[in-house]
Regions:
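Residues lining the SAM
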Residues: 119-121
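Class I SAM-dependent methyltransferase SAM/SAH-binding core
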Residues: 58, 65-106
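Conserved beta-strand signature within the Rossmann-like core of class I S-adenosyl-L-methionine
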Residues: 146-153
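A short His-aromatic
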Residues: 124-126
Length: 153
């Protein structure tokens, strides 16, 4: 939200514009997903890497905020997404949760996190190996020492 970062543009796939038009249907299309259970698995992974208890959690490519809906119950959360329309839905779902419009490759927040997650194959929208390296470096920049990045291919 205001002042947390300098948004930029990055090398994500121009096909991401498809999500702008689909935003209002996105949750219905993905209704088959069990976000609560997936979130429990994410928390188990984070704990297995020594991140017990309440953590600062950044969800990159957060979409409509379905994982954040469960993560915020036990963690301090922030979401980043490149779609204004997805974030509009997420803001209705997640009042009070900071949500930032930015590209996963170039976002800059003024804080670090214990966990950075990037789920639902969002990383696959990057176009080159260099884009992937740069994006992972960006994730690392936003992690506290000993922090964990959880990326779903």
């Amino acid at each position: 939200m205001g002042g947390e970062m300098g948004a930029g543009t990055g090398p994500t796939d121009p096909g991401l514009s498809q999500f702008h038009g689909l935003a209002k249907y996105y949750d219905a299309i993905n209704d088959w997903k069990d976000y609560r259970r997936e979130t429990e698995r994410l928390e188990t992974i984070a704990r297995s890497f020594g991140r017990p208890g309440r953590t600062a959690w950044l969800d990159v490519a957060c979409g409509t905020g379905r994982h954040l809906e469960f993560l915020r119950r036990r963690h301090t959360t922030v979401g980043v997404d490149g779609s204004r329309e997805m974030l509009r839905i997420a803001r209705r779902r997640l009042p009070g949760v900071p949500l930032v419009l930015a590209d996963m490759h170039t976002f800059r927040l003024k804080r670090r996190f214990d966990v950075v997650s990037c789920l639902f194959s969002a990383i696959g929208h990057l176009r080159t190996k260099e884009d992937v390296r740069t994006t992972f470096a960006n994730f690392a920049r936003h992690l506290n020492p000993g922090g964990v990045a959880i990326v779903e291919p």
